[in-house]
Amino acid sequence: LSTHGSNYARNNFKLNIYNESIENHLKKNIKYDLIIMADVMEHFSDPYKVLSQINKLLNQNGKLILTTFNIDSLYAKFTGKNYHWIIPFHMVYFSNKTLEIFGLNNNLKLVKIINDPRYTSFGYLIEKLNLIFPKLGFLFNILSKINFLKNINVKVDLKDLKIYYFEKISD
């Protein structure tokens, strides 16, 4: 989290927000029933170590919910090098199996995988589709000129974004 974001949450929502590394937070010996990590696992250079540290922060029956994309999804395989989540600041890519193994090796049992559709403006969707499917650029250019379409929100479900639900296994 940014300092600005942490302060905003503290001041406006009266939340206990910690803006520090996991290593520093572990020293406080605080345990949690639930930890949520939304769209962050792919940014860690050593996600295996992060899961080990998260395990230490969970109570005995603690839960971990994390969201990330499944690199083995049909959509990711179909788009290949044009897959829109292959970007420089994503350091690691996961499959369902990889996360299951990482979890088990860190006393976290993968209990459930849920599809995680997102919503976006039609204008943004057209921009992205133009990058992924450049041969259809003529069609996307026509659609992008229809102003009222740009701000319509659409549900996008490519079956590649997932919510992973883990439960801590006794130490």
Feature names for model-found ranges:
Residues 1-78, 93-106, 161-168:
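Conserved SAM-binding loop
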